[in-house]
Regions:
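Non-catalytic C-terminal accessory region of glycerolipid acyltransferases
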Residues: 3-8, 43, 64, 76, ...
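A conditional alpha-helix N-cap/helix-loop micro-motif detector
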Residues: 102-105, 129, 156, 177-181, ...
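Conserved beta-strand termini and adjacent loop/short-helix elements that scaffold enzyme active sites
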Residues: 107-109, 150-152, 177, 253-255, ...
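Catalytic core of membrane glycerolipid acyltransferases/transacylases, capturing the structured
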Residues: 118-179, 193, 207-210, 214
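Membrane-anchoring hydrophobic helices of lipid-metabolizing enzymes
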Residues: 1-126, 160-162, 169-171, 319-324, ...
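Soluble or luminal CAZymes and related metallo-dependent hydrolases
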Residues: 15, 50, 104, 179, ...
Length: 367
């Protein structure tokens, strides 16, 4: 019975998203924006698990001093921001490149474009802030012909195909997080060719992430971006995003250099910690635009489940390395240890949707 209900729910979810894409692109923008804001308000008032986790995460950001009422006001703004993200995702296919460029306020754009123009690749780790899909469409509109990212394969499969097609239609190259694709090898190839790779990195969805200090607590984050920078020599440039009134804001931060000393693992860990520090500053400046409705801090995690996930991740790495060795090596000719360094195979986070924001559990923070 549970499988039947799950299948029915999956079909309903896929149909809902298809309808949203069709409708939002056809109704007046002001109407659609109002509807999504109301949906965000309803989700916030329901105080489901997702909103409660959002408030728990925001408490780490703002500290103990703000009252419960002030924290609730912040989470309310956060759910409205999350609703705006979803509205804009559905609206992106009809937003012109001219508007994407005109309405973006970005610090550090020339830094990134200069790096790419020199022929050097760049890997951009980013948190689930603002509108990361819009930011991707914006960089394409700025003249970058294409960039590569990784996303989880959503369920049902029809929804996964739709999201892959949506992002590919915007100019993204999307690699599935599962399915036997040699992701690290492909990403490394793109970077060595002077390409751009963007990887959401503020939450470990694999169990194999790097432990970092984050707002004074332990958390696990994706280390794949740092591993790629160490492996390929690409520039590691963290990005933070936010909503700037009706416009969009972004900051492409200065490159995090590879440490001169230490083992490969130690270098990746140190660079990932620096990424976390950049994320801290960006989130603290715009906490309402951090759409983290899931557990991210170690204190909130089920440690038994985390240990099981880590064991699964290690087994997957070993299996992938053995398979690649049997086949003569990975796509980029790296060793099994190098390929295993891309610990955060996901990168994109599983789809929650705005409605699930009121009752989220262990899913991701967005597609």
């Amino acid at each position: 019975m549970s499988k039947v209900l799950s299948a029915v729910r999956g079909r309903v979810t896929a149909a809902s998203y298809a309808a949203a894409w069709w409708l939002v692109c056809r109704v007046p923008e002001s109407w659609g924006r109002w509807v999504f804001q109301q949906a965000g308000e309803i989700a916030w008032r329901r105080q489901g698990a997702g909103v409660q986790l959002l408030e728990a995460n925001l408490r780490r950001v703002v500290g103990p001093e703000p009252s419960g009422k002030e924290l609730r006001a912040l989470s309310r703004a956060g759910m409205h921001s999350y609703a705006r993200y979803w509205f804009e995702v559905f609206r992106l296919p009809v937003i012109s490149a001219e508007r994407l460029v005109a309405d973006m306020r970005c610090e550090g754009k020339d830094r990134l474009l200069g790096t790419l123009a020199s022929g050097r690749g760049a890997v951009l780790p980013l948190p689930h802030m603002g509108n990361w899909d819009q930011a991707g469409a914006w960089i394409i509109a700025c003249g970058v012909p294409r960039f590569t990212t990784v996303a989880e394969r959503l369920k049902p499969e029809s929804l996964a195909r739709r999201f892959f097609a949506f992002r590919e239609g915007l100019g993204f190259e999307v690699l599935p997080a599962t399915g036997g694709v040699q992701r690290f090898g492909i990403l490394a190839q793109r970077l060595r060719a002077g390409g751009l790779v963007c990887l959401p990195a503020d939450r470990d969805v694999t169990g194999g992430g790097i432990e970092v200090d984050f707002f004074g607590e332990k958390a696990h984050m994706m280390g794949g971006a740092a591993a790629l920078a160490v492996q390929t020599g690409a520039a590691l440039m963290p990005v933070t995003l936010w909503f700037d009134g009706p416009l969009w804001g972004a900051h492409i931060h200065e490159e995090i250099p590879v440490p001169g000393e230490g083992t490969r693992r130690e270098k990746v860990a140190a660079m990932t910690q620096q990424v976390a520090r950049v994320f801290e500053a960006g989130i603290a400046e715009h906490p309402e635009d951090w759409h983290m409705l899931q557990r991210v801090f170690a204190a909130d995690l089920d440690m038994a489940r985390l240990a099981a996930a880590q064991a699964t991740a290690r087994a997957a790495e070993e299996a992938e390395g053995a398979a690649a060795a049997a086949a003569g090596g990975a796509a980029d000719g790296r060793s099994a240890a190098d390929r295993a360094a891309l610990n955060g195979r996901g990168g994109g986070g599983a789809l929650d949707g705005l409605a699930d924001g009121a009752d989220a559990s262990e899913g991701g923070s967005g597609p």
